[in-house]
Each structure stands twice: as structure tokens, then as C-alpha cells.
A protein has these predicted regions:
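Short, acidic/polar N-cap/turn motifs at the starts of alpha helices
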Residues: 45-48, 98-100, 114, 133, ...
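Glycine-rich phosphate/pyrophosphate-binding beta-alpha loops
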Residues: 61, 65, 118-134, 198
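A generic structural signal for short beta-strands and their flanking turns/coil linkers
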Residues: 97-99, 113-115, 139-144, 178-180
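Residue-level signal for tight coil/turn positions that link beta-strands
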Residues: 52-53, 140, 211
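ATP/nucleoside-binding phosphotransfer catalytic cores, i.e., glycine-rich phosphate-binding loops
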Residues: 105, 111, 137, 147-223
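Gly/Ser/Thr-rich active-site loops/lids in small-molecule metabolic enzymes
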Residues: 76-83, 124-155
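Catalytic core of DAGKc-family lipid kinases
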Residues: 2-119
Length: 223
């Protein structure tokens, strides 16, 4: 739609295995109900993202547990649903490593080694991690950025787990920001995942929030 320059409202019927974006928008996963809500709904403007010359709806991520979203065979997804991603993540455990990157986040420079990173506009990340809904606004022109490095010891692991469960993110191993634009400098061998699809790595990646760039049809709110 963006490539075509079209402003046509989009009706979205969630049919995937995880449906993170639909969960954030509170869309029905029942096909007939979703279709009826589209027919009777109203168009609402939402942010989307650009990743160099590509677009994504709700998440761009790299590192631990991100490969499974595009590497898991479709027949396994169909048979097991969300469990297929969990099993794929378990297979990735021996390959988890720290990844050196440099970032500029709305002018703030960061450099470090991270095992996971996500740029998202969703309260649910891979169905495994929930971001505090009070921190997520799909129409504010900003993404939530989460970077997680390897913990140093069991005490820091416990602190990190508590910070994720409490949705406070006040842990030395976690960096959390809300930004509208970021630039990433990395190894070109590091692939990303955009809405569950593989994006081949680049040395420099620019990610930008496209403020209210698309219109999605949603169920009308009760007066």
C-alpha cells in the first residue's frame, strides 16, 4: 500500500499462528467475526515502520529466538500453532550469543553486545514477551526499543526476569527506549526479522516510524 501511494483503508483478518499485531489491536481471530467487524467498522490511522527500503507493521527484531518466526516449517506452524515457535526457540538455545552493534536512538549513541533486540509497536512480542500497555501507543509516532544483553550471574538473571515480569525494565541487562528513528551499525551477516519474515542483514540499517501512515478498519467503539 505504501509503495503504491494508496490511502485505501485496510481490513485485517488475523489467520496466523501468533497474531501479535491483532492482539494489540484487539481484533477478533474468528474469521467471520473479524469480517463482520470490518464491514461495520471505521478506519483508524496507525503508525508503521520503515527498515531501509522495506516496511513492517509492528516489529523488527534480531538475535535470540527471532529466527524461528521465519525458519519454522509452515506445516509445523499449522499443526502446533504457537508451540511450534517455542520448540524452535529451544533448538536455538545452543546458538545464542552476544552481538556487537552500535546504535543512534533519536540522537542518543549506544554501543554494546546484545543477545536480543526489538523495535516494536505492539504489546506482544512473539507471543512470549508482553510490553506494558501503558508504554505502547500505536499512533504516537514512536517505537519501543528493547535491547537485552547477556546477564553476568544468577543474581542479575533474577533481576532481569523480575523486570520483565513486572514490566518495569529497570535492570542493568535491559535497555528500553521510546524513539521515532534509529540507526544501527552491525555485521552484514546479522539477519533481522520483520513481522516474522527474514530481512537480510546490512552494515547500516535505518529504522523510522512513519506516523499514522496507514488506515486500518476496526470495530466501532460503543458510544
Amino acid at each position: 500500500m505504501l509503495d503504491a501511494g494508496s490511502d485505501c483503508p485496510i481490513g485485517y483478518i488475523p489467520c496466523g499462528s501468533t497474531n501479535d499485531f491483532a492482539a494489540t489491536l484487539k481484533l477478533s481471530t474468528d474469521i467471520m467475526t473479524a469480517a463482520a467487524e470490518i464491514m461495520e467498522g471505521e478506519a483508524v490511522e496507525y503508525d508503521v515502520g520503515s527498515w531501509n527500503d522495506r516496511y513492517f507493521s509492528y516489529i523488527a527484531s534480531f538475535g535470540a529466538f527471532t529466527r524461528g518466526s521465519y525458519a519454522t516449517p509452515q506445516n509445523l506452524k499449522n499443526a502446533l500453532g504457537h508451540l511450534a515457535y517455542v520448540l524452535s526457540g529451544i533448538q536455538e538455545l545452543p546458538q545464542i550469543r552476544n552481538i556487537p552493534i552500535r546504535l543512534e536512538l533519536d540522537g542518543e549513541a549506544l554501543e554494546g553486545e546484545y543477545l536480543f533486540g526489538a523495535v516494536s509497536n505492539s504489546t506482544s512480542v512473539g507471543g512470549l514477551l508482553t510490553i506494558n500497555p501503558r508504554l505502547v501507543d500505536l499512533r504516537d509516532g514512536k517505537f519501543e526499543v528493547m535491547l537485552v544483553r547477556m546477564v553476568r550471574d544468577t543474581a542479575e538473571l533474577a533481576e532481569c526476569v523480575a523486570a520483565l515480569q513486572n514490566q518495569t525494565y529497570d535492570c542493568a541487562a535491559i535497555t528500553f527506549r521510546s524513539v521515532s528513528r534509529l540507526t544501527v551499525h552491525q555485521s552484514p551477516e546479522l539477519d533481522w526479522t520483520l513481522d516474522g519474515e527474514r530481512a537480510e542483514g546490512r552494515e547500516t540499517i535505518t529504522i523510522q516510524n512513519l506516523h499514522r501512515a496507514v488506515r486500518l478498519v476496526q470495530k466501532r467503539e460503543e458510544p
